[in-house]
């Protein structure tokens, strides 16, 4: 009889797969195709599993005796199992002291193993609840972060509005107002308008220099106001 095959807890090194998925192989269509979906059973960590198995399998399906009833309180049963493990461990120590070679030692070890299996099984039954709570907490954190971001944005918006209002209040009353002719006409242009535009080009060129000077004066006045605001304590 050969020696039992050692099963590694880690997957095999991926180098044998990386060499097959080079850029050249992918472009030429020579890269191996993904394996087909598993339909029946598969091996994981040396154990065989069925695809339709439950995530948390019942104890009876694993050939393990159930120590608690079908309807029970998880918290109460976990406390009882914890106390039973402690008592059985003390009994095992007493057996090791009095008669180390007794058969009762193996019985106590099996009892402890069964108790630990039940503890892990009850803890695993809390996994769906733990996943829901983790998702709930994560969504609450995201909601709080978004609300804080919106609040900071609102504060910055109010500050900008206040600064603009202060700038408008600080402007002197004798600044020249923008002329109505500077507004851009957005309506569709007909044939008469296009003819009028050709006649108005020369007049607009004459006024463009004067308007440019006015815009420069306004920019200079705004720069002076901003400098004065920055110098204020």
UniProtKB/Swiss-Prot annotation:
Pfam families named among the record's database cross-references: Med7
Annotated compartments: Nucleus
GO terms for MF: transcription coactivator activity; ubiquitin protein ligase activity
Superkingdom per UniProt: Eukaryota
Record-annotated disulphide pairs: none
Modified residues (Phosphoserine): 194
Gene Ontology BP term (one): transcription initiation at RNA polymerase II promoter
Annotated Gene Ontology cellular component terms: core mediator complex; mediator complex; nuclear body; nucleoplasm; nucleus; transcription regulator complex; ubiquitin ligase complex
Coiled-coil ranges from the UniProt annotation: none
Chain intervals for the UniProt region annotation (Disordered): 187-213
Main localization (coarse): nucleus
Family annotation (InterPro entries): Immune_Mod/Transcr_Coactivator, Med7/Med21-like, Mediatior_Med7, Mediatior_Med7_sf
Crosslink position(s): Glycyl lysine isopeptide (Lys-Gly) (interchain with G-Cter in SUMO2): 185
Cross-link (Glycyl lysine isopeptide (Lys-Gly) (interchain with G-Cter in SUMO1)): 185
Subunit record text: Component of the Mediator complex, which is composed of MED1, MED4, MED6, MED7, MED8, MED9, MED10, MED11, MED12, MED13, MED13L, MED14, MED15, MED16, MED17, MED18, MED19, MED20, MED21, MED22, MED23, MED24, MED25, MED26, MED27, MED29, MED30, MED31, CCNC, CDK8 and CDC2L6/CDK11. The MED12, MED13, CCNC and CDK8 subunits form a distinct module termed the CDK8 module. Mediator containing the CDK8 module is less active than Mediator lacking this module in supporting transcriptional activation.
Family per similarity comment: Belongs to the Mediator complex subunit 7 family.
PANTHER family, sorted: MEDIATOR OF RNA POLYMERASE II TRANSCRIPTION SUBUNIT 7, T-CELL IMMUNOGLOBULIN AND MUCIN DOMAIN CONTAINING TIM
Name of the protein described by the UniProt record: Mediator of RNA polymerase II transcription subunit 7
Organism listed in the record: Homo sapiens (Human)
């Amino acid at each position: 009889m050969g020696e039992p095959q050692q099963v590694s807890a880690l997957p095999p090194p991926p180098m044998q797969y990386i060499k097959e998925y080079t850029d050249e192989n992918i472009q030429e269509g020579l890269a191996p195709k993904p394996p087909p979906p598993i339909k029946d059973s598969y091996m994981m960590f040396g154990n065989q599993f069925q695809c339709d198995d439950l995530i948390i399998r019942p104890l009876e399906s694993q050939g393990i005796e159930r120590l608690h009833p079908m309807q029970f309180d998880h918290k109460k049963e976990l406390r009882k199992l914890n106390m039973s493990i402690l008592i059985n461990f003390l009994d095992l120590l007493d057996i090791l002291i009095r008669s180390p070679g007794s058969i009762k030692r193996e019985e106590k070890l099996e009892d402890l193993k069964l108790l630990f299996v039940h503890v892990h099984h009850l803890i695993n039954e809390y996994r769906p609840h733990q996943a829901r709570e983790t998702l709930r907490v994560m969504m609450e954190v995201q909601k709080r972060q978004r609300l804080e971001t919106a609040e900071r944005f609102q504060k910055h918006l109010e500050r900008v509005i206040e600064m603009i209002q202060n700038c408008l209040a600080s402007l002197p009353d004798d600044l020249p107002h923008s002329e109505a002719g500077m507004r851009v006409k957005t309506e569709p242009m007909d044939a008469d308008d296009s003819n009028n535009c050709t006649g108005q080009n020369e007049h607009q060129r004459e006024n463009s220099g004067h308007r440019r000077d006015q815009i420069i004066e306004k920019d200079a006045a705004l720069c002076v106001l901003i400098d004065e605001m920055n110098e204020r304590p």
